Amino acid sequence: MRPILLSGHERSLNQIKFNRDGDLIFSVAKDKIVCAWWSANGERLGTYNGHQGAIWTVDVSPNTQILATGSADNTVRLWNVKTGECIKVWDFPTAVKRVRVHPPMEADCWPVTEKRMGFLGTIAVLDINYGENLTEQAEEPSLRITCTESKATVAGWSYMGKYIIAGHEDGSVSQYDGKTGEQLENVQAHEFDHQINDIQFSADRTYFITASKDKSAKLMSTRNLAILKTYVADTPLNSATITPKKDYVILGGGQAAMDVTTTSARQGKFEARFYHKVFEDEIGRVRGHFGPLNTVHIHPAGTAYASGGEDGYVRVHHFDKPYFDFMYEVEREQLRK
């Protein structure tokens, strides 16, 4: 499984995303630009320029028409994917750490803002117009959720936009009503005061995986926030994703970036870890990055995954035949029946 190495950023990666078709990858880093790549061969299509600070987050609409980014310059920007034109800028009082586009095409985009300078962290819902005139967008959020106790660090939409699921700085996970913003549930999923760094959903959005500084990832139900599975690692985790074709999850993390120069790549545990989704066993690791993995994302068809690291590189791995052939004995017996 030889990786394709994508070198287009001067600083560490913050987030990478495949589009729904899986033919494009979008990456953002601390260097103010958004890169678009062909996933098949790693060729760079182009960049989106305009932010004045580190870009923390990126997401793309299901039809790959609109790209949304959030930055340390306190703005959310909407881009026309095809032309690279910035079509809308929303200003916020603090940095925008996460932005998500709701899967249904007619729905919303929303940012998670930082708790800083006297401002509380918020989750804001922005209505997106997918019509012919993309520049005509709403000026103000249609819904704003204020996180009074512990700031939200990551969040995502559930199935049908019924809930907003948020991960918090104190290791808890909250469920909010998608229409009113009312908090319905709050569960201490991870150790107290160990921040949740990532939440990624299954294809049908009925369950999701968290990645936390407490060296574990949790598979949780969207409906009631029940913890379904726990994957224990030996290093703090920054990102986790669920593979659609095989029953695996991929975790990414590593020793804290400030300690990286004092250690070798192996000691730093800078590897993508593969766990069996059902049995919770670690089944393999993929090395390559020199520095922690900050973000991992799976191809929608489950045929490849991409990882972005503190070293400034994106690595795209297309899975070989042995990846798809590997099965536990109990899985083989199930097929024989």
UniProtKB/Swiss-Prot annotation:
One Pfam entry name: EIF3I
An annotated Gene Ontology molecular function: RNA binding
Keyword vocabulary terms for this entry: Cytoplasm, Initiation factor, Protein biosynthesis, Repeat, WD repeat
Main location: cytoplasm
Family matches, as PROSITE patterns: WD_REPEATS_1, WD_REPEATS_2, WD_REPEATS_REGION
InterPro entries: eIF3i (IPR027525), WD40/YVTN_repeat-like_dom_sf (IPR015943), WD40_repeat_CS (IPR019775), WD40_repeat_dom_sf (IPR036322), WD40_rpt (IPR001680)
Gene3D superfamilies (alphabetical): YVTN repeat-like/Quinoprotein amine dehydrogenase
Similarity-based family: Belongs to the eIF-3 subunit I family.
Function as written in the Swiss-Prot or TrEMBL entry: Component of the eukaryotic translation initiation factor 3 (eIF-3) complex, which is involved in protein synthesis of a specialized repertoire of mRNAs and, together with other initiation factors, stimulates binding of mRNA and methionyl-tRNAi to the 40S ribosome. The eIF-3 complex specifically targets and initiates translation of a subset of mRNAs involved in cell proliferation.
Full protein name: Eukaryotic translation initiation factor 3 subunit I
Species name: Aspergillus niger (strain ATCC MYA-4892 / CBS 513.88 / FGSC A1513)
Lineage: Eukaryota, Fungi, Dikarya, Ascomycota, Pezizomycotina
Name of encoding gene: tif34
